[in-house]
Amino acid sequence: PFCDNTTEADLQTQNFNNQTTPLLISNKGRYIWCDGPFRFQLRDGKIRIESARGTIEHATAGNTLKEAYLAASGKYLPPTGILPPELFFSKPQYNTWIELIYNQNQEDILKYARSIIDNGFPTGILMIDDNWQKDYGNLNFRPDKFPNPKAMVDELHAMGFKVMLWVSPFVSPDSEEFRYLKTKGYLVKRKGSDQPAILDWWNGSSACYDLSNPDAYNHLRSTLKKMQQDYHIDGFKFDAGDPERYPEKEVDVFDRQSYDTEQTYLWAKLGLEFPYNEFRACWKLGGQPLVQRLGDKKYSWDGVASLVPSMIAAGLLGYSYACPDMIGGGEYSSFQGIDASGFDQTLIVRSCQIHSMMPMMQFSVAPWRILNKENLETCIKYAKWHEQLGDYILSQAKNASITGEPIVRHMDYAFPNQGFEECRDQYMLGDKYLVAPIMSSGNTRTVKLPKGKWKDDLGKVYKGGKTYTLDVPLSRLPWFVEVK
């Protein structure tokens, strides 16, 4: 969950825009766990760790990364036997964010959905992103942008899409909802005051639900359920909930034990009430049927290069049902000012290829708007390849729901003691596919194969235990299966 070369972190206030779990694991079979957030530091080959909120536990479960992970996840993050709806895994997902940003509106959302079908992409889940609502905390569509939202959702359903809506725990401070929630005591308060705290976040300054108050929690849940009934919405993209928004030094909450990470936990726990869910911030809920999206990646090669190591980390924290952000990136400011003809088409295609052999893939920037015919056909090919892999990916998701095993696996997890400890650019998709994507602008890459005999995507057989350099034209995603 940490940035490259992280030497220290405080999980009470830092989540690096991603999911976190109070767990450190070693490929030597050891792990460290704490029920509460901890601060740790790596220096001179030693780990210094401290926590004010829990007992720090450490154990040796064996001699490998797999043994350490399975022991820790089985004890602290046990799988439930339940997984998110199959559609998350079997079809591509689509999100209106990069195309519309804050101009979410009925006409353009329907146009985006029709373009998905017209360009030959499979239908799946469609997420309507931020600024569809009248105010934060108000779950009514803006009438100036959505003249008939129920009809829009029904039309999207008729096209073959499931529909999810962006929501957050924030409440606009000059809204009718704010006044009501303030009266009821449902909002996080300023430290030492009975007045709601106004918290800074990426869209401004807002009040925020205090989900440690059971009545506030139930009110928000009921409001979301009612919206589902009124507009036929299938589920929600639960954004925000980051622990740094609830600092103990600055706010008061209903349950005085529920600051920072506990509010993150309660926000994510709310998602268990809605099978169609997606989270970016999450705390200590590995093994649960919650869909996790990696934090927003920039439209850049650095963003592409971060996908594999970040997905591996998510799996090792118990978050198997994960999506590697949006194809090409989800950090909208990195897309601004770029003409449709000015995009790095190679970057988009390589990002799409990586997504295609992940548990989930999600489009946002419209490939048909920014790619030439040949590269568009390549993206369609890999969207359909993900669809073809659907049954296999779903089988691995079902396995994760029973055993807790990651779907995206570190090479050292699958092949211990073969020199893969530092490998961050290839991975196993379940127990079958070794995936070695291109994550830079070049057309060659080096692949290290485990012992045994391996066959690649072109049918060529290789002797394992060796390193190979492959030619990888833009139309190709290298993957291997072991020949028994």
Residue ranges and their predicted role:
Residues 1, 122-379, 383, 412-415, ...:
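Aromatic- and carboxylate-enriched substrate-binding clefts and catalytic-loop regions
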Residues 115, 120, 142, 155-162, ...:
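Carbohydrate-binding surfaces of carbohydrate-active enzymes
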